[in-house]
Design a protein with these regions (language model features):
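N-terminal lobe/hinge region of extracytoplasmic solute-binding protein
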Residues: 32-80, 112, 178
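Gly/Pro-rich hinge or "lid" segments in bacterial periplasmic/extracellular proteins
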Residues: 48, 156-212, 222, 326-330
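Aromatic- and charge-enriched surface segment that lines or borders ligand/interaction sites
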Residues: 76-118, 272
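Surface-exposed binding/hinge segments that line
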Residues: 79, 124-165, 187
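Ligand-site clamp/hinge motif
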Residues: 201-244, 432
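Append "and occasionally in soluble cytosolic enzymes with long acidic Gly/Pro-rich linkers
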Residues: 274-421, 554
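Extracytoplasmic/peripheral linker and loop segments enriched in polar/acidic and small residues
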Residues: 434-443, 467-529, 555-556
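Long beta-strand-rich cores associated with HINT superfamily self-processing modules
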Residues: 528-556
């Protein structure tokens, strides 16, 4: 599903023929692993490794392509109502692996099962669904509780069989053996694992070279990695920490854009951050290129907004606030501290009232009144200039004495490196800062109590391209942004949504409400005995596995 392939680099083995003899791998199959499942029901399962396998067995109404955009899967035709409150859908001529048709009743049953399963990873996606109106075996209408721009993007849950699950134990493995995807479950035991065979009756054409798959059971995620290292499994997703173990000729490394988003938050309880010029000064001072190369060791894709950079809603034409020391200093010179000299302003007001009262007690000639008026205007102008100069000096003094508190999780080495770079960048424009490395609990407490000035944090981007929760969590709000966000979430067409998102992204950039840094890259490691290209993504690491073949000398 959520496909987001980035650059792919391949390291080929010069001795492929030796690999088979070095391992217990079954050369006729593509060999995968999953943690021993509690259930193989794709709706109630909560283990990622199991979910990746079941994505091969079950299809969804819609799925996500390699650019993180929604596309139809089981859906043949669809039409969104003009008011955005419903969607009419016609299904493709898909069949279950037992030969029966996938029907509207299966969709209705699946939605009901998800809504009853509070722990389902798909539960959130169905909360806006009010009802399903079945018109025929292939035609139905989904009605929504509220208008929502990303209603289609939410329909990416796998469809399960009503016939095999209704009024039965939904978690019993024997009731979950029949799917509708490109692969069907040939056999499954905890001891022998699972064998997936090519579904030759799939509703769309599949590659002629498509291979069967054998899935081994392992106790935990670490074992999945170890199996590939030992050449006993062909493919797995790995963390950056494990990646260095695979820099050998036996493996292919595929890099793709994940969903871990990194950014810098401002504390708006600090009056300086309420000044857009101060925020822009911070933004212009930060060297993002250096952060990507040194902080994240080129293991991230730079972004200027919390969306995957390949999304159709991401404004790639929008230029970020560039790293420019001179512009940063120019912005600092424009900073105004609204609360400076508030006591003096009140004192001056009282004095002016007394002076005016005293002057008004004496009757003046027209010439004297004109002269007095001119003198008063000059005095007010002079006082205004003096006040402005005092405030400038006060701001300069405050900036020179400022020591911004930067908080960062002590267990995240990349963010610590980034914090040190930001510390150096700020010092270059005359702003001092101190880095506080905190535990998970202390980090959470500091964020909740607003005990920071800058915070280096991360979010897991939603599968649905809705950045509203991240924007809300940034702490910045005003009527104009609220208006843009309302227009975004209530838009009813792709054109409207793109326009609204463009307005939101431009406004956030122009006002430097927070600083987007990057989306982290993820990695898939595969045995070099395989050939072909896959397009993994954070939601479905085996996306495109049907395109893989086994080198001829490996399958003999």
């Amino acid at each position: 599903m959520v496909a987001g392939c980035s650059n792919t680099k391949t390291k080929q083995s010069s001795s492929d023929s030796s690999l088979q003899s070095q391992s217990s791998i079954d050369a006729k199959y593509i060999n995968l692993t999953m943690v021993t499942p509690k259930t193989i029901n794709p709706i109630t399962n909560t283990d990622k490794s199991v979910g990746y396998i079941m994505n091969l067995v079950y299809d969804s109404l819609f799925t996500i392509d390699e650019n993180y955009n929604v596309i139809p899967q089981l859906v043949k035709e669809y039409n969104i109502a003009q008011d955005g409150m419903s969607i009419d859908i016609k299904l493709k001529d898909a069949k279950w692996h037992d030969g029966k048709n996938v029907t509207s009743n299966d969709v209705n049953y699946t939605i009901g099962l998800i809504q009853k399963s509070a722990d389902s990873p798909y539960n959130e996606f169905t909360k806006n669904i009010a009802s399903v109106n079945i018109k025929s075996d292939k035609d139905f209408t989904i009605k929504f509780k509220a208008r929502y721009a990303f209603s289609i993007d939410s329909l990416i849950f796998p469809i399960v069989s009503q016939n095999h699950l209704d009024s039965k134990d939904v978690n019993d493995k024997n009731n979950n053996m029949i799917g509708n995807g490109k692969y069907k479950i040939e056999s499954y035991t905890e001891r022998e694992g699972m064998v997936l065979s090519v579904n030759k009756d799939y509703y769309e054409e599949v590659p002629k070279t498509m291979k069967n798959i054998k899935v081994g059971m392992v106790p935990n995620e670490d074992a999945r990695t170890s199996m590939v290292m030992a050449l006993d499994s062909d493919i797995t997703n790995v963390t950056l920490n494990d990646l260095s173990k695979f820099q050998e000729k036996e493996f292919n490394i595929t890099k793709y854009q994940g969903r871990d988003y990194e950014c810098v938050l401002f504390n708006y309880n600090n009056p300086f951050f309420k000044d857009v010029n101060f925020r822009k000064a911070i933004a212009h001072s930060i060297d993002k290129d250096r952060i990507i190369s040194e902080g994240y060791m080129d293991d991230a894709t730079p972004v200027n907004f919390p969306l995957n950079s390949k999304s159709k809603y991401y404004n790639s034409e929008m230029k970020d606030l560039e790293f420019n020391k001179d512009k940063a200093i120019e912005c600092l010179a424009k900073v105004e501290y609204a609360n400076v000299n508030s006591v003096n302003q009140n004192d001056n007001k009282v004095k002016n009232q007394k002076k005016s009262a005293k002057k008004n007690s004496k009757k003046l000639t027209p010439e004297e009144e004109a002269k007095a008026k001119k003198a008063e205007e000059d005095r007010i102008k002079k006082e205004a200039e003096e006040k402005k100069n005092r405030e400038k000096e006060e701001v300069k003094k405050s900036l020179s004495e400022m020591n911004l508190k930067i908080i960062v999780n002590r267990d995240n080495s990349e963010r610590i490196k980034t914090a040190n770079i930001i510390n150096e960048n700020l010092k270059a424009i005359g702003i001092n800062s101190t880095i506080n490395q905190l535990s998970d609990k202390d980090m959470e407490n500091a964020l909740n109590s607003k005990n920071y000035d800058l915070a280096l944090v991360g979010w897991k981007l939603s599968i649905i391209p809705d950045a509203s929760s991240i924007i809300a969590s940034s702490g910045y709000t005003d009527d104009k942004l609220n208006g843009y966000m309302s227009a975004l979430t209530s838009s009813t067409s792709e054109i409207e949504t793109k326009k609204a998102y463009k307005d939101v992204q431009t406004y956030i950039k122009d006002n430097a409400t927070f600083i987007s840094l990057a989306v982290r890259n993820n990695y898939i490691v595969s045995n070099s005995r395989l050939k072909g290209k896959i397009t993994p993504n954070d939601f479905d690491v085996y996306e495109g596995i049907s395109n893989l073949d086994i080198k001829s000398n490996e399958s003999n």
